[in-house]
């Protein structure tokens, strides 16, 4: 994979098509014009620098967020080619920056492996920026060109001399295109850290001039460091992650690191050419198949399983597993426009053979670790058998079997899942108000008694014995865990409605932890919402006003002429304090209510937060609370 092509010049830049469509349909190129698309601009430019690193020419990438939310990305690579393009008869830098699909990623000349999104990077960023500047240091000189909304604003010219080499791109996202142009430091740092883990030895520096923050991501341990980082708030079963690597000629390289923790969830993150393949693909399938076979072969060879014993299932073997699977290949095939599933069929066998050989060898050379892995899988296997019976209870019942729905569920009359919504409400008093205030045609109410089980600390067999969890799983209709099928949901909106106090927040977190661990698609496919009941009711001269925050309360008081003896302010402690009409009007009426949609922008970040908040380790939880306490808007003491 390290084979180099020393010459990177204008002859290696191929042009496929023009740039006109990008500003008209930005979503086609960067996914959206919301915050995700905004951050994607940075990733596109950084990906180009990473490609230089993978080719062996770049070791240091710098990213600056400036005070006005413009961004500069620089690297110490070879620098963009500065000659005149053979076909376009323009400076090659100008071709790369102004013509879609012009890049060194096509034809295989400049880069063996590339992670940029279809090679559209630089030109798309330029098209969607109010201002863009490119500075290239190469061949002893510094060259520069500026652009305005994708069009050339100054000629490509030499502006000085330098012994250094590399490319620097400055851009200011266009407010005419993006709904919001403010960058989130944590979002960028998460991705840049990920890239540094995936490309060991590379140094990526992030500087935020708005808040005077700076971080350097540099991991000589690569994927081993990545897995240790992912497990840092968990109790690990063995100290050092297992690491294996292998390659097939210069076209495929495979790296895998894995480590077990004492939890019950599997967390496997797969990447192809540095792109997080959220939907998995052939590399992930090859890893799972090989790991299951290797562990079973080892268990039989060393007497942990008798000849007639049933094999351990993949699910048993992956309980508590944290792993990162990274493949790099010259011609990746990504399925779907989102580029999140690797489709190359040959990769499955390549990953399988490398894992089979290297992990088998590792376990035989480290029998104490082999024993720890097998023991954990055997305990998981026994728990899975115990869970089988309980799981059957929660499988989806058809409409004809609706008598098996939980007794406390007040169902809606409509059977059209798309229009139906279910409110998860804490306590019977709030449940009573919600049942009376709802629209019975499409709104169902499921009251829960007290706090549900913390699933972060329990195995599936115990979880399936919890009455509250059984009630939710049966009411929703999609099943639970590996049996969960989002297409069988009975309601397309699942709305968590809890009191606006600390207890309410805790119950909400417990419910979300359960959804994230055992019904992930509920969240990833956009079915989970948080209701926003008002915090205050203001009554003045027989008129009622509702405020959903302290700021809104100030605004309401200002609108009604200030607070005086005729002003009554009621602070709602719980949903039960509202009568059915008020609850409908403020929190349940689709015409007036506010709902917060829950999504998973980043599975790793979500896993980390749930581990910290709901796991056993006290220190990380204390640190998280201390760091985030200032962000709390409402806190009852």
Curated annotation (Swiss-Prot):
Domain of life the protein comes from: Bacteria
Name of one Pfam family that matches: HATPase_c
Keyword terms, alphabetized: ATP-binding, Cytoplasm, DNA-binding, Isomerase, Magnesium, Metal-binding, Nucleotide-binding, Topoisomerase
Cofactor(s) in the UniProt record: Mg(2+); Mn(2+); Ca(2+)
Transmembrane annotation, as ranges: none
Toprim domain span: 420-534
List of residues binding Mg(2+) 2: 499, 501
Molecular-function GO terms, alphabetical: ATP binding; DNA binding; DNA negative supercoiling activity; metal ion binding
Subcellular location: Cytoplasm
Extra information: Few gyrases are as efficient as E.coli at forming negative supercoils. Not all organisms have 2 type II topoisomerases; in organisms with a single type II topoisomerase this enzyme also has to decatenate newly replicated chromosomes.
Full protein name: DNA gyrase subunit B
UniProt source species: Clostridium acetobutylicum (strain ATCC 824 / DSM 792 / JCM 1419 / IAM 19013 / LMG 5710 / NBRC 13948 / NRRL B-527 / VKM B-1787 / 2291 / W)
Highest classification ranks of the organism: Bacteria, Bacillati, Bacillota, Clostridia, Eubacteriales
């Amino acid at each position: 994979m390290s084979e180099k092509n020393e010459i990177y010049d204008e002859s290696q830049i191929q042009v496929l098509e023009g740039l006109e469509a990008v500003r008209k349909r930005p979503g086609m190129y960067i996914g959206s014009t919301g915050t995700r698309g905004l951050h994607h601009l940075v990733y596109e430019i950084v990906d180009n620098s990473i490609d230089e690193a993978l080719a062996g020419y770049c070791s240091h990438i710098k990213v600056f967020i400036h005070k006005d939310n413009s961004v500069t990305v620089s690297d110490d690579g070879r620098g963009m080619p500065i000659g005149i393009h053979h076909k376009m008869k323009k400076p090659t830098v100008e071709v790369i920056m102004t013509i879609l699909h012009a890049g060194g990623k096509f034809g295989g000349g400049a880069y063996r492996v590339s992670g940029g999104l279809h090679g559209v990077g630089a030109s798309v960023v330029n098209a969607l920026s109010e201002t863009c500047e490119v500075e290239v240091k190469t061949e002893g000189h510094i060259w520069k060109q500026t652009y305005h909304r994708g069009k050339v604003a100054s000629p490509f010219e030499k502006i000085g001399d330098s012994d250094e080499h590399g490319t620097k791109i400055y851009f200011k996202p266009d407010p005419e295109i993006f709904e919001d142009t403010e960058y989130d430091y944590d979002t960028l740092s998460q991705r840049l850290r990920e890239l540094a883990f995936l490309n060991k030895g590379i140094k990526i520096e992030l500087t935020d001039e708005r808040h005077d923050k700076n971080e350097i991501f540099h991991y000589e341990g690569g994927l081993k460091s990545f897995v240790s980082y992912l497990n840092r708030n968990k109790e690990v079963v063995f100290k050092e992650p297992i690491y294996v690597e292998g390659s097939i000629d210069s076209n495929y390289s495979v790296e895998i690191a894995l480590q077990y923790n004492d939890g019950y969830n599997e967390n496997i993150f797969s990447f192809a050419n540095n792109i997080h393949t959220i939907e998995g693909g052939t590399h992930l399938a090859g890893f799972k198949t090989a790991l299951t076979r290797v562990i079973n072969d080892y268990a039989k060879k060393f007497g942990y399983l008798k000849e007639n014993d049933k094999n351990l299932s993949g699910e048993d073997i992956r309980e508590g597993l944290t792993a990162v699977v990274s493949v790099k290949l010259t011609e990746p095939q990504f399925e779907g426009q989102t580029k999140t599933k690797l489709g190359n069929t040959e990769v499955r066998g390549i990953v399988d053979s490398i894992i089979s050989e290297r992990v088998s060898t590792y376990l035989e050379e480290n029998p104490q670790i082999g024993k720890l892995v097998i023991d954990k899988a055997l305990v998981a296997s026994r728990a899975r058998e115990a869970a089988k019976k309980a799981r059957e209870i929660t499988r989806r019942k058809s409409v004809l079997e609706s008598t098996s729905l939980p007794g406390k569920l007040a169902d809606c009359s409509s059977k059209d899942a798309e229009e139906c919504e279910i409110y998860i409400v804490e306590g019977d008093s709030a449940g009573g108000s919600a049942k009376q205030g709802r629209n019975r045609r499409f709104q169902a109410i499921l009251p829960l008694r007290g706090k549900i089980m913390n699933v972060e600390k329990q195995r599936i067999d115990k979880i399936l014995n919890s009455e509250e969890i059984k009630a939710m799983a049966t009411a929703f209709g999609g099943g639970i865990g590996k049996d969960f099928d989002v297409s069988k949901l009975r309601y397309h909106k699942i709305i968590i409605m809890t009191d606006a106090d600390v207890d309410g927040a805790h119950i909400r977190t417990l419910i979300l932890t359960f959804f994230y661990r055992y019904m992930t698609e509920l969240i990833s496919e956009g079915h989970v919402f948080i209701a926003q009941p008002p915090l205050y009711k203001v009554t003045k001269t027989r008129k009622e006003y509702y405020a959903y925050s302290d700021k809104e309360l100030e605004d309401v008081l200002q609108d009604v002429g200030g607070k005086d003896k005729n002003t009554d302010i009621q602070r709602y402690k719980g949903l039960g304090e509202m009568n059915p009409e008020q609850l409908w009007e403020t929190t349940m009426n689709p015409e007036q209510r506010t709902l917060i949609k829950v999504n998973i922008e980043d599975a790793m970040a979500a896993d980390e937060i749930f581990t910290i908040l709901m796991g056993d380790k006290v220190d990380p939880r204390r640190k998280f609370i201390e760091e985030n306490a200032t962000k709390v808007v409402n806190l009852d003491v």
